[in-house]
Every structure is written in structure tokens, then in C-alpha cells.
Amino acid sequence: MADKLALPLLLPCTPSSKPYSHDQNHHISRTPFLTTSLSSPPPPPVEPLLHDVFLHQNPNSRQPISSQTSRNRNRTRIGKSRDPNLGKPWSYHGLSPQGQQVLRSLIEPNFDSGQLDSVLSELFEPFKDKPESTSSELLAFLKGLGFHKKFDLALRAFDWFMKQKDYQSMLDNSVVAIIISMLGKEGRVSSAANMFNGLQEDGFSLDVYSYTSLISAFANSGRYREAVNVFKKMEEDGCKPTLITYNVILNVFGKMGTPWNKITSLVEKMKSDGIAPDAYTYNTLITCCKRGSLHQEAAQVFEEMKAAGFSYDKVTYNALLDVYGKSHRPKEAMKVLNEMVLNGFSPSIVTYNSLISAYARDGMLDEAMELKNQMAEKGTKPDVFTYTTLLSGFERAGKVESAMSIFEEMRNAGCKPNICTFNAFIKMYGNRGKFTEMMKIFDEINVCGLSPDIVTWNTLLAVFGQNGMDSEVSGVFKEMKRAGFVPERETFNTLISAYSRCGSFEQAMTVYRRMLDAGVTPDLSTYNTVLAALARGGMWEQSEKVLAEMEDGRCKPNELTYCSLLHAYANGKEIGLMHSLAEEVYSGVIEPRAVLLKTLVLVCSKCDLLPEAERAFSELKERGFSPDITTLNSMVSIYGRRQMVAKANGVLDYMKERGFTPSMATYNSLMYMHSRSADFGKSEEILREILAKGIKPDIISYNTVIYAYCRNTRMRDASRIFSEMRNSGIVPDVITYNTFIGSYAADSMFEEAIGVVRYMIKHGCRPNQNTYNSIVDGYCKLNRKDEAKLFVEDLRNLDPHAPKGEDLRLLERIVKKWP
């Protein structure tokens, strides 16, 4: 795809950055933190703090013997719920009486592991001339140790066995498979792979069970690409997969977000090998549809499953319901719930959580809360996923007080936060520019005995990226790799988005190329990420090419695809194309989902199209969707720019009634509105208000207040705000300086204006064309063209690094604009 975009790619090189730290100016306290208020009135303090909830949790975990650090992951093992022996007592089937006696002694707490070698020598001495009996005894013995969770002893027993003379003649694949499985459960997947490769190099013939065990071990530890590589090697070696192998690799494909056509091709190959899908296969295929929001494909598999003679179970219904939820179709998800109940299946916590997530994802938080209450009334207690989903939903909608209230309810219910909860708080603080608080939450993860997961790192990358902090993005990425995480598709997508938000589009495309080189296949989320990057640059023609590529069959577009196209048209000033796409949404050619209507409000506001913005806002509400904080901010912004104070206040009242917490964008829009009015002093009042709430103003906030005072010739007040801005750690930009220069020039204070130019150059800020235009135009407005020309002639003395031809441009401006 990068080739089709015809975009210049940088050579792979990571931008230089200091070793990543939370804050170079002060040390971050490791005292657990979740008490800072985000709004007014402040939410109740969150005491006890997160680590107190984890007081009895053991943070110690076994580390794998591998070059790659593993992460503990809570994953359902393939086939675990269908194990016919689940819950049954251990049977000594296949184990000799002496073996049973040895096993009983080994599982005793006081067994001296130093005696293991001699005990094993005595046990296997009678079998030394009977290879088949040795193998059977070893298999039963290892299974017994595994049943009693004595994995370490089992692995040591196997190591002892491998040191025996002619061990290969006594070893069979059943033993290899069970050892690989044990190593996988112990997090020692690399050791399992090394053993597997060593046996192959020694000439041992590995069968399908050994291959499948290694594939499962990689899959269960989240090392999906390595699982696929083992599957490919298995086929290359002429080893035929079984149904279980296919089911495991289909599950891996789903986790990787493999394109649907590749998944269906594998199923067809399975059938051509004479292997018929079972119920687990169909359930896995439905689950595979989640990543691409493939609700139609999931419904088709659902019908095929029935036609094949299989009965639906709770897993089937939950999987289909989840696909509808992730496809932004909560109504269809609710229909699945009703059908599930009619067929005699009681909704589980998984069912309710999927539905709550579906409603929260679409901003339908009242419905999500109603479901939570409904599940509690029916005896299903909300768990950490329920609360964290609601917390994230309220945060995303801009309702921070409601989010904190949910966290309080979670604590009071005795529900321990998990890593997802921490990730939600990291995102909440990061989205509001509270980076110190965000990093305290990050520190608290380890204090509470947890470890950051891939989502934690991706969230940090996204937060720093959307704030244009490219050196921090590079620093986090380095720390992430140092922690042992291998970038997967979501990380690459996040990096593409982060660098494009920082204005480093070439670097974003370099990341995309690296992703392809790493063997990661683009999916819907990747295409949408690239489209979003193109949209930021207004590159609408290339966006249309990407859309055409998707529609050609590689990947079915969704509502986020069209959202990016709207942004591309808006940023590229293609208002006609934007209107045409909007009409397709309103007419139903493209389904008018909530996120599309919200995007229409945003792009129309950005393009200052008031009637169109109001239409999109009305359509959103009339179709039963709830506006979020971004949508409401867009309406405040467009009303503020047009000095429609009553309308802007009406939106603010709506926000207050519905429990929305004003964001920095809200405050900046209000400051902008007042900065252009007779009541310009109100801009600083709002600045003081947000400071009092513990929110750090950004450069836009300070520039707006400076403009308010400069516009009204209150230069001392403007200078006071400038000093305050610098003291807060925010570096003035060219807009800041140009505001002063323009104001001084308009008041004939040219000496002061030129003094500001010297000051900005001295402090590392380069003047732009607007800087010098203001001074030249100021002279010309007063009919002082000669002085304007003298200023231009002396420009090189003032700014030795001014662009070549800048003086000629300014002289031409004097002639053409001021004849």
C-alpha cells in the first residue's frame, strides 16, 4: 500500500531522544496516586489508593528462560472448558505400582529434590531393556506430576531422562508434547522451542501432537507470529495438521487480525484435507470477525453452523453478540441476547460485559448503566471488566465525575482493579494533559504487583503522540522494547498515528514500511490508521486511492474509514466532496452511524460551515445518539468564532445538565470567543478558573489571552501573561511573538516590534512571513513606505538566517499591496 501512496519514506532511523523519564525537572513520587481532581466540583477522594486494594496480591512471578521476556497473560487454554477429565480425581492408569509409590513420595511437601536422580534411576532400572515400557512409564509419571502442579519436578525428571544413553529409542512424541505443554504453562516457551529444534537436529521424528503443542504454547503466550511460523514449518515438513491444530491456528489468526479471505482459505484447505469443522471451529470463526467488525460474515458463519447440524451454545451466542457490539450495533447484540435466553441459556458475566461495552462504545451510557443494574438484579455481580468498561466509556464521553463515581462504586464493592483499569486512568489523565498524574499511575502499576501490558505502552504512545511530543513517543517505544515487548500490529498502528499527529508524516510511513518488513499484515485498523494520517495532511487524493484499494476486496471499509475521508476533504479544503459524502450519509447510502454524524459536526465546525454543523448536530440527536465532549466542543467553537454567545452558552448549559466535564478545548473555545469581544477580560478569568481546577493550560490558552490584551492595547497585561506562560514551562511559539509584533506595529511602536523580533531569534524561535509582513504593513498603513523599504534592506542585519529571497518578497509586497 505504501507504494501505491507514492509517499517519500525516510530511511529507518528512530528520532534521537533522551533516555525516557517521567519528568526531567523533578522526581516523580512513587506514592500511589488517584486523588487529583479533574473537574469542578471535585470528585470525592479515591482512598484507599489503588495499591491498597492489592494489599494481599503476590507480585512475584516466575520468569522464563528465554531471550525474550514473557508477560503473564490470562488466556483461556484451547479446549480447556471441554476437558472430560476436568474436576475428576487423578487416575494412576499406565503407571506401575512402583511408579505410583514414587509419585506419592515426590508430591509430599517434605520431599528432598536433591534425591530425584537416584529415585528416578531406581524407578526406571527395570525398564532399561524395554523401550516401549519406559516410554509409557515416563508418560504416565510426567502426567501425574503435571496433575499435581509439580511442573518443576516434571521438567527436571525429563532433563534426567534426556541425559540417559540411547534416550531417543525410549522417547515418543506423547512425552515431547506433554513437556512442551508444561514449558508453555511455565512461561518457558523459548525453552520449549529450543528443545523442539534440538530434537529435530538430533534426527528425532516429531509428529503432529508435538507440533500442535508448540503452536499452542506460542499462541497461549501471545507470540502469534511464531505460532504461525511453526504451523508453516509443520506443513513444509509434510506433517498433516489435525482438527485441533487447525482450530488453534484459526484462533491465532483471529487474535492477529488476519484478513478474512485468508481465514476462509485456511478453512477450505482444512476441508480439502478431509477434516470437517466442529462446533469449536465455528465458534472460533465467529470470534475472528471481531477485529474487522465483520458482523455480516459472523451472521453467515452462525447460519452455516446450524446448517451443518451443530447446536448453538453459550460460547456461540456470546461470540456473535460481541461481534455486533464491536461493530457498533448494540441493537442487534441485544437481539442475540433475547434469542439466547429464549433457547434456555442464561446470560453470563461475559454476555453482560459484551453488551455494556457495545453501548458504552457508542456513547449510550444510560443504557450501559441500566444493563449493569439489570445484571445485578438478576444475581450476576459486576466484575472488574464491567466497571472498567463503564469508567472508560464515561471518560471517553468527557464525563470525568461519572467515571470517578464508577471507580468509587468498584472499590466499595471490593473489586480489585486490573491492568485494564490502570490503562483507563492513564488514558484519562493523558487526554487532559495531566502528564505528571498519568506517570504516577504508571508507577503505581508495579507498586500494586502488576506489570504494564501492550495496551499500557500503546496508550502512552498514543497520548504523547496526540500531544505532539515526538521525543517522548520515541522514548516510550524504546522502553517498551527494553521491557521485552515485541511490536505487534496495534503498536505499529499507534506509532503511525502518533508520528502523524506530531507532524512527522514521513516517519509515520517509515513505521508502516517497518511493519510490512516485520511480516505484519495490514488489517482494517491499519488502513484506518494510515487514512487518518493522510487526512491530517489533507491528502484526499491519496486517501481515495487507499479507499479504492480497500473496496477492491482487501479489506471492507467501516464508518471510521469514511470519518477519515471526511477529515481529508475538510483539511484539503475540498468542501464540495465533503458535502457529497455527507449526503451519502444522510441518505443512508453509507449507514449514518453515531461516529459518522459526530465527525460531520466536527469537520463542518472546522470549516466554519454553521448551517451544515447545526444540521449534523440535529441529525445526531434526532437519530437517538448522544453527543460526546468532542462534538459539543465543536459547537461551542463555531458559535464562539461567530460571537454567538447565547448559542455557545446554550451548549454549555446542555453539557452541565448532562454531566459533561469541560475539557481544555472547551475552555480554549470560550477564551477565544471572549478575546474578540468587548468583554475580553473574561478570557483571563477563564484561564484562572482552569488553573484553580488543577488543569494545566496549553500554549493555545496563553496565546489566546495574550491576543485579547494585545488587541485592546493592554501590552503590560499581555507581557504579564507572557512571563507567566514561560514560568509554567510552556515555550512561546511564533504565534505568540507575532501577536506582540503585530500589535506594536499597529500602534506605530516599530522599535518595540523589532525588539521582539530580536528577542524571539535569540530564544530559538524562527520568524515567519507573517512576522515581517506585520512590520512592513504597519509602516505602509501610515504612508511610511520609505521606512518600510529601509527595514527590508536592513533585514539581513536583523536576521542573518532569513530565507533566501525574503527581502525581494517583502519589496514586491510593498509594491503590489501598497501601490
From Swiss-Prot:
It holds the Pfam family PPR. The keyword Protease does not apply. Keywords: Repeat. PPR repeats lie at residues 172-206, 207-241, 242-277, 278-312, 313-347, 348-382, 383-417, 418-452, 453-487, 488-522, 523-557, 558-592, 593-627, 628-662, 663-697, 698-732, 733-767, 768-802. Residues 57-93 are annotated as: Disordered. InterPro entries: Pentatricopeptide_rpt, TPR-like_helical_dom_sf. Coiled coil: none annotated. Belongs to the PPR family. P subfamily. This is Pentatricopeptide repeat-containing protein At5g02860. It comes from Arabidopsis thaliana (Mouse-ear cress).
